């Protein structure tokens, strides 16, 4: 039996497992497009928490981040790395790229799902240095990027523009999309989504109940 050694055993409240159950219930309607739902998929390391395969050949890999604290998910959380560990963004991109380049799927989605709120304030790193860097509020930044990418005129990375004060941060973001062409980077940005401020554990329990009640007319 294979084991994904980096796959978490679920947080104390089994948050990612409930999300998996929530999506698995979507297989009950006879006209659904979901082919399978896998928890902690052995073939992936970053997008392994919940993997959804669709009958159309599309696949969605979800990394779940649960917290009981009130801290938000920030731009810095995405790009932060250490000498021994790549950034969260690089991890998600690497797994997505593996899916994308395999040729096994008609389309590959990468999703970061969390009950944390999206950061709403700019921040600064390297304040003590000569070249401090302004990092954008993640919620504002990501919304703006997704709007630009959705425009049919956005055909390459250079089509995406950011505020001048964010340019260095944007370059840092793109640098985390390692060993890839600009075309692949753009495809990832189109396929990547950050879902912040999701339901907590109790909220997903209620969502599951509502789905079951609806399907079985309880």
Segment roles from a protein language model:
Residues 9-75, 79-80, 97:
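Catalytic centers of nucleases
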Residues 1-13, 64-218:
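Acidic metal-coordinating catalytic centers involved in nucleic-acid phosphodiester chemistry
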């Amino acid at each position: 039996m294979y084991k994904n050694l980096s796959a978490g055993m679920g947080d104390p409240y089994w948050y990612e497992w409930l999300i998996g159950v929530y999506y698995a219930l979507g297989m009950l309607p006879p006209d659904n497009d979901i082919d399978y739902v896998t928890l902690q998929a052995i073939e992936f390391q970053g997008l392994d928490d919940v993997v959804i395969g669709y009958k159309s050949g599309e696949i969605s890999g979800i990394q779940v981040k649960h917290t009981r604290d009130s801290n938000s998910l920030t731009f810095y959380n995405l790009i932060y790395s250490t000498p021994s560990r790549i950034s969260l963004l690089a991890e998600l991109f690497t797994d997505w790229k593996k899916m994308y380049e395999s040729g096994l799927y008609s389309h590959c989605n990468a999703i970061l799902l969390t009950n944390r709120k999206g950061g709403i304030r700019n921040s600064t790193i390297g304040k003590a240095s000569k070249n401090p860097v302004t990092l954008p509020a993640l919620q504002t930044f990501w919304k703006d990027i997704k709007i630009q990418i959705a425009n049919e005129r956005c055909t390459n990375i250079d089509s995406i523009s950011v505020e001048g004060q964010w340019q260095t941060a944007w370059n840092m973001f793109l640098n985390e999309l390692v060993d890839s062409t600009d075309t692949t980077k753009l495809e990832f940005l189109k396929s990547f989504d950050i879902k912040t401020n999701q339901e907590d554990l109790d909220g997903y329990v209620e969502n599951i109940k509502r789905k079951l009640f609806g399907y079985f007319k309880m």
